[in-house]
Curated annotation (Swiss-Prot):
One of its GO terms (cellular component) is mitochondrion. The keyword Mitochondrion applies. It comes from Mus musculus (Mouse). Keywords: Mitochondrion. This is PTEN upstream open reading frame MP31. GO terms for molecular function: L-lactate dehydrogenase inhibitor activity. Disruption phenotype: Enhanced global lactate metabolism with elevated glucose consumption, increased ATP production and decreased perigonadal fat pad weight and fat/body weight ratio. Elevated serum and secreted lactate levels. Conditional knockout in astrocytes results in initiation of gliomagenesis and development of neurological symptoms that include seizure, ataxia and/or paralysis at 55-65 weeks of age. Interacts with lactate dehydrogenases LDHA and LDHB; interaction with mitochondrial LDH leads to inhibition of lactate dehydrogenase activity, preventing conversion of lactate to pyruvate. Disulfide bonds: none annotated. It holds the Pfam family MP31.
Length: 35
């Protein structure tokens, strides 16, 4: 999925700690869009 690759790319760019926060933010946004 494009979200997974985006999180991975962001993780490499920002570092693991920021990536975890970004990943959770993207999951929430994705959940809202799917509803």
């Amino acid at each position: 999925m494009w979200r997974d690759s985006l999180c991975t790319a962001a993780g490499y760019a920002l570092g693991r700690r920021d990536a975890a926060a970004l990943s959770s933010l993207l999951s929430e946004a994705a959940a809202m869009m799917e509803v």
